[in-house]
Amino acid sequence: MAYRFIKWFEELRKEDVPLVGGKGANLGEMTNAGIPVPPGFCVTAEAYKYFVENVKISKEDVKRILGEKANKGTIAEVLAQAPDEPRPLQEWIMDIINRTNVDDSKQLQENTAVIRELIKSLDMPAEIADEIKQAYKELSQRFGKDEIYVAVRSSATAEDLPEASFAGQQETYLDVLGADDVIDKVKRCWASLWTARATFYRAKQGFDHSKVYLSAVVQKMVNSEKSGVMFTANPVTNNRNEIMINASWGLGEAVVSGAVTPDEYIVEKGTWKIKEKVIAKKEVMVIRNPETGKGTVTVKVAEYLGPEWVEKQVLTDEQIIEVAKMGQKIEEHYGWPQDIEWAYDKDDGKLYIVQSRPVTTLKETTTEEVEEVEEAEVILKGLGASPGIGAGRVVVIFDASEIDKVKEGDVLVTTMTNPDMVPAMKRAAAIITDEGGRTSHAAIVSRELGIPAVVGTKEATKKLKTGDYVTVDGTRGLVYKGIVKSLVEKKKKEEAAAAPGAAVAAAPLVTGTLVKVNVSMPEVAERAAATGADGVGLLRAEHMILSIGQHPVKFIKEGKEEELVEKLAEGIEKVAAAFYPRPVWYRTLDAPTNEFREMPGGEDEPEERNPMLGWRGIRRGLDQPELLRAEFKAIKKVVEKGYNNIGVMLPLVSHPEQIRKAKEIARSVGLEPHKDVAWGIMIEVPAAAIIIEDLIKEGIDFVSFGTNDLTQYTLAIDRDNERVAKLYDETHPAVLKLIKHVIKVCKRYGVETSICGQAGSDPKMARILVRLGIDSISANPDAVQLIRQVVAQEERKLMLEAARKRLFEEEEEEEEFLF
């Protein structure tokens, strides 16, 4: 049967996120890599889209489904103004959402519940239902049965909404049996796109509700005898030579949800020596519901298996090593440490991989940090998003209007953070959120700021009150009642040990290709410098300028130019000082119009259909020279203090004249390019790559590839467009040919080459760039060490290949001489 709405795992790759979401794409990737993944298929995002756009309902249908609820609140308003003829479900959904104040939790709960009820109550179109039934039948027949147990999981597809950000927001259904039950669970997955939490998150992050879709993964259920999670790099010590395995009895939900304390095993890569075992008391386990034959229940291990199983080692030593080796295989495939869910099936005794995602929380921490604190009371558990210990007075806030309540050293507690809360986050001793995952805003910013954070606690804003005192363990994801002195003392010792000059770190790898770091905020300069990076390949201006809280041009027009200059100079100096004498490349302002428009005073910003192709970068800088002039004045102030390690980097350059005019503005404030500062450009526009020789002749010292934009512009692909995002590929031959051409020409003229796009943090891309002869690679702070290792390995390979080639040539010459 030719399917329109179904994709089998075998048909999918990791690039298919827009089609089947992160979970689905990853399962397809692993299946095709030969990893033992239970087979299955995905009901594509197109099916959800077809459902909401083609199922039409009338006023009477809505009233029949909702009953008394139809006469209350927002839905009553929608019904009163709706036309009499039936219309697509999507229009009903958007009418309800557009009338919803997401900050009114009661209204948000009520309105999203109405949407979910409508989705669950309506019949699935026959064209979709028939395909699901047929695919389920085919899957069952693979195992010689009419029906098999499956898991049905939600998989969000909007590429710019990280999968982890949806943790606990969309649904997962286990031990589903029968085609009709599968169809029901797929609809329930669709409905879970409209939970209050997921809706609030999208609204606060500025995502368009109408463009977020959901895929449903239908996968053969592993009848787990034992299961768990493994990290292919020790997330506590950041040791990439160790694998950490957590294991418990039954289905893996107990481990993932934190309902059980699992066994923990530490395995050394390569030698496969089991370095450590911690056998836990496993009080509960999740199993298939024995009464209904469907779904799951949580039972006590002592009652279900027997008292002796509570403290029994879950995995045999042979199984520990088997799991660890499988983890290493998956890590090698992806080129990055992985967080993997695994299970042993009691029916065939085999190991299966259920899910894998990149580890995002690796940090340098001390082993002391995770010692048990027996006397302390744990009052909340969540995801350890940013390691370390923080303690202080709790301040609960619900939106950015309350950030002034958070004082220096407070513990910030909120539903979820957003960019407007960054000023408060900087002041906080620790951060706790109800929602979010390891790639949520709270997690990313906390890691960059070096502030301990626990996210996804679900109930922090309910359990904690302003004025409470807590201690936050951002490594283990725990929140303790009160100030735990032993943990706070350990933190002080750690800070003392980490202070500049307090200890001599292990000698870093020395590489011919420099490894630099990207810095978004001056506040993280010291931490970024501590990575051992060879300089800053990208210091972003956006955060410093946007943090003034007002449109910068309006700020200048109000006579506050000096204030802006001081603010910028302060930030630039902080980074230049932390890295001196290592180079710091400052990129001039590159914020698109939509970011400016959201600021106070930004009402006159133009409405652009695609701001990334619009008025930004050097284009805007030359049109509004007062802003560029303020940036150059700030740099001059820092240079006059003796910091001669600064470079100016112009974004979105496409013509030599832009370089010439920018230099004129710099000279007008007394800043001399090439003498006071190094002068460079971003290579983001294909035009810049093609005419690189002309740009060099205008006078530049360095170039840096902005691969995010370069890839989009070269391939004519909008990464935010789910229909074409799967075609986005930074390693596309056309992109690599442009990069290779620029590097070749720059070497001829002695111009330094670098990269500061997201690709700089990708091990695969780093290997390619080393072979192309790039001079430096700038990575995100948490990727610097990994990229340095990758660079060192690739350079050694190149030297070995060259030596072997020379040896073979000498042997051939010797043979010719002898014979």
Swiss-Prot record:
Substrate binds at residues 540, 587, 684, 706-709. Its cofactor is Mg(2+). It catalyses: pyruvate + ATP + H2O = phosphoenolpyruvate + AMP + phosphate + 2 H(+). InterPro entries: ATP_grasp_subdomain_1, PEP-util_enz_mobile_dom, PEP_synth, PEP_util_AS, PEP_util_C, PEP_util_CS, Phosphohistidine_dom_sf, PPDK_AMP/ATP-bd. Pathway: Carbohydrate biosynthesis; gluconeogenesis. It is an enzyme of class 2 (transferase). PROSITE patterns: PEP_ENZYMES_2, PEP_ENZYMES_PHOS_SITE. The keyword Metal-binding applies. This is Probable phosphoenolpyruvate synthase. It comes from Pyrococcus abyssi (strain GE5 / Orsay).
